[in-house]
Amino acid sequence: MRASSFLIVVVFLIAGTLVLEAAVTGVPVKGQDTVKGRVPFNGQDPVKGQVSVKGQDKVKAQEPVKGPVSTKPGSCPIILIRCAMLNPPNRCLKDTDCPGIKKCCEGSCGMACFVPQ
């Protein structure tokens, strides 16, 4: 083995040892600093740099937004005849798709708007 080859092997061993030590001790690699910018003062939100309002919970979730009621009163009529289609077309998907008091019910061939019983 020539001296230059031996020197290259030694350099790689030293570099590998240094990388291994940095990984074990948790030393951050240059350019990967965990904290950038100013350190927030007491009571300041570290994310946006704003002071939190007293009595306001940062983590509390908001109530879900309630939309219009999707079901109308009444029950769907009983349908005695069924079509032979495998996937019949639907004229509606929910009660709000139907005008007035009509409900979206299973018809003889797909969903359709019916006057409830």
UniProtKB/Swiss-Prot annotation:
Keywords, ordered alphabetically: Disulfide bond, Protease inhibitor, Repeat, Secreted, Serine protease inhibitor, Signal
Protein name (record): Elafin
Gene assigned in the entry: PI3
Lineage, top ranks: Eukaryota, Metazoa, Chordata, Craniata, Vertebrata
GO terms for cellular component: cornified envelope; cytosol; extracellular matrix; extracellular region; extracellular space
Propeptide: 23-60
PROSITE patterns the UniProt entry points to: SVP_I (PS00313), WAP (PS51390)
Record InterPro entries: Elafin-like_sf, SVP_I, Trappin_transglut-bd_rpt, WAP_dom, WAP_four-disulfide_core
Domain notes: Consists of two domains: the transglutaminase substrate domain (cementoin moiety) and the elastase inhibitor domain. The transglutaminase substrate domain serves as an anchor to localize elafin covalently to specific sites on extracellular matrix proteins.
Role this protein plays: Neutrophil and pancreatic elastase-specific inhibitor of skin. It may prevent elastase-mediated tissue proteolysis. Has been shown to inhibit the alpha-4-beta-2/CHRNA2-CHRNB2 nicotinic acetylcholine receptor and to produce a weak inhibition on Kv11.1/KCNH2/ERG1 and on the transient receptor potential cation channel subfamily V member 1 (TRPV1).
A molecular function GO annotation: endopeptidase inhibitor activity
Domain of life, per lineage: Eukaryota
SMART domains referenced in this protein's UniProt entry, alphabetically: WAP
Chief localization: secreted
Cystine pairings recorded for this chain: C76-C105, C83-C109, C92-C104, C98-C113
Residue intervals of the WAP domain: 69-117
Signal peptide: 1-22
Protein location: Secreted
Region entry 2 X tandem repeats of SVP-1 like motif, spans: 29-72
CDD domains documented for this protein: WAP (cd00199)
